[in-house]
Amino acid sequence: MNINNEILQLMKDESLIAFENDEIPVSCIIVDRDGNFISKGINDRQSSRNVLGHAEINAIVEAEQKIGDWRLDGYSMIVSLEPCDMCNAVIKESRIDNVYYFLPKKTQDINTKNNINKVEIDGYNQEKVYFLELLTSFFNNKR
């Protein structure tokens, strides 16, 4: 997938906002078939006091509100970290076509058969390093 510079910068900015708000620094963008920005989301479980406050779910909710439909056929998700099981289930139900992620999860989920087209993004090494450094710094500060 070819990701334009504006979306890359937005993802970096959003991850930094999450980090500065003491949230796990994950960002998510939803784009249409042409790669145009539709919605964004960051983790906000602590500030929202809501277990559903994952970047992917927040981006999906914003996209649904923007387009006026819960069906997101024809849309793709770009996320800084591979989605968890909960997010995978919501992604599947929302019918998002493709999920592209920069960093793979380090933990194995329980549900490995989710029938979602997930692809780790090739290249973009600077962005991968950026997201990894934010996540590492966040968790190092928690220890």
Q: Where do the language-model regions lie?
A:
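Short beta->alpha transition motifs characteristic of CBS
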Residues: 39-45
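Glycine/small-residue-rich phosphate/adenosyl-binding loop
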Residues: 39, 56-65
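Short secondary-structure boundary/capping segments
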Residues: 68-69, 113
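A short, polar/charged loop-to-alpha-helix boundary motif
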Residues: 47-57
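Zinc-dependent deaminase
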Residues: 1-21, 83, 89-143
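Immediate flanking context of iron-sulfur cluster ligation sites
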Residues: 69-81
